[in-house]
Amino acid sequence: MLVEYFKNETAKVAQSCLAEIKTLEDWKNHREKYRQQLFEMLSLSPLPEKTDLKAMVTGKVEHEAFTVEKLHFQSLPGLYVTANLYLPKELQKPAPTILYLSGHGPVISNGISYGNKVAYQHHGAWFARNGYICLILDTLQLGEILGLHHGTHREGMWWWNSRGYTPAGVEAWNSIRALDYLETRAEVDPKRLGATGRSGGGAYSWWIAALDERIKAAAPVAGITDLHNHVVDGVVEGHCDCMFTVNTYRWDYAQVAALVAPRPLLIVNTDNDTIFPLDGVMRTHDKVRHIYQLHRAATNLGVVIGPGPHKDTQDLQVPVFRWFNRHLKGEDPIIETAAVKFFQPEDLRVFNTLPDDSVNTNIHATFVPTAKRPSVPPDQQAWQQQRDTWLSLLREKSFAGWPSELPPLDLKQKFSVVRNGVRFQAYDFSSQPNVPLRLYLAHRESLKKPDRILLSVMDATGQSSSRSRTGKDATLAQGSSKENSPASGDRQGSFPAFEEWLAIMETAFPKELTEERMAIGASTNQSERVHSAQCFERFRASLQTNKTIMAFIAPRGIGLTTWNPDARKQVQIRRRFMLLGQTLASMRVWDTRRAVQAFREIKGMKDVPLWLQGQREAAINNLYAALFEPGIAGLELYQLPKSHETGPDYLNVLRVLDVPQAVAMAAERCSVRIQDTDEHGWDFAAAVETKLGWKESQFELSPLAGAK
């Protein structure tokens, strides 16, 4: 089902890409909006201040035909960009200039990084020997100061999504500032600037050419394909985060490429490139060609396909050289010189000692500003304005990947049985096409008129032997000790993840839960079965003392829809969601909303007060579900993370608000009880409640046991 889901979502994005552009007038009306969206998705909105570059040449290397200046500049204070500037000798007038963006070519020896500019020196040398100035940049990750591109790829930094951060934005910004630097050089003709690079550098060539019209011609090499290749064919697994935007507006890559039009653009690739497959490259080219045709500039768009794999070869280099000769020089001579390397890595090194004030290694923590901590609103009107702004921004920036229209639920009862005085039911429903989920209900057999529903949203964090990570027994019936809580009595222990829930429930209902056991495997041992039976008996006994319907839902990727358990595969599944302008967490919020909607379609359940319950990430997902789904009476939130820095990732959420502000909004709509959570950091919700005169029971906090 997951494969089909990704196919369907990718197809929707592909179909919408540039679909509204029918005429040149359409394009002109949309172009600047698109460009501003791209700035935003590259973490560049608002655009950083253009501070003093503090450019410095640290040395020179001489060749008989050109000079190489070893230089650095600061694109932001402390964000150093190391580069080599190739200058032809005996220039008579300002020359056409190429910004060359380096790909992933590490040059590291004896613990010293010389920068990936060294790996691409032959390109700079060719351009300089043929009358061009060429500035070759190091990248953030593989420069002389080593930064990071692999936040979600291998470092588990999912908060990058919540920040709206991508290292592609740093590379784009460094390129913009590189053009600023080139404009300060008397040798450079600023009206004849071109951009190229291959692999990662090909991607950065796309960013700078799309964002900055100072680039008059571009020739990205092996740096683009479409979402179908990335998401459906799995190409994403071979790429780090510098290749991707934060896809807030759900673009396909042709939309980036179209922003270069009508300027000269050459798309270059090979026919056997496994990380930029040819079919996706050509689909991208076909969509971009339409935009060039609208401009009557079809001859400004070219495509070159060379033979072979993902490799820097003459078959790709020569067409690029010719492209710039034609469009920056107005000539097309025979290419007689090959691109060759002349220097050792040590020759091109900029820094003998790295600067102490560099922020390169941690720029991901500061590049995108987060939302400022809000003040408590002075009155109801101010609060409503703030609340409505937050909700609108969340829907637009964080949850745009939700379906725009409600698909059919297709609710069907799977089973309904009674054992040991407990009625246990299950209903299948569709959260989205290709996302089937199952809703479970349990209550005492004799219950006729329930007074509440407690819907527990299970997470994927497995424990062993039905024990919590704190050693407490897992339990299925919970609630605070308040009289109006959804379950009577003090909370006992920690409610389980799906596998623990299954172990408990199948002690009484093994036949009904056969599919679930097959889905997750790993049956329990005798000792665990005995313990699970004891947990079920406590659950059964609790149901006899109240009128609560206990309900359970496992969102996508958990329970029946469990995916490949391999940790690396789980990472790449999450990154696929990310590329589609979603996150796994944000779509689990949607699943929770759909579970509530499904409940309302079950006979007799429409008007029963419904509470949501969850812990850790599921607790935050429930919190946001309550902001967008009407009719939720209350929230029981356990071990609630205080920030999306450590909690679930939703695109851009930290640019809008953080968890405490979401708690305040939820508390206006329903009762919110935060349990087993550090008491510090929740003062905003309490202050809003007090200032606006809400009922004292709207927001309650029970700190961690033993906390002072």
Task: Locate each region found by the language model.
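Short, solvent-exposed loop/turn and secondary-structure capping segments
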Residues: N84, A95, I108-S113, T139, ...
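Gly/Ser-rich "nucleophile elbow"/oxyanion-hole loop immediately N-terminal to the catalytic nucleophile
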Residues: E90-K93, H153-R198, I215, G489, ...
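Short beta-strand element of the alpha/beta-hydrolase
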Residues: K93-G105, P450-A460
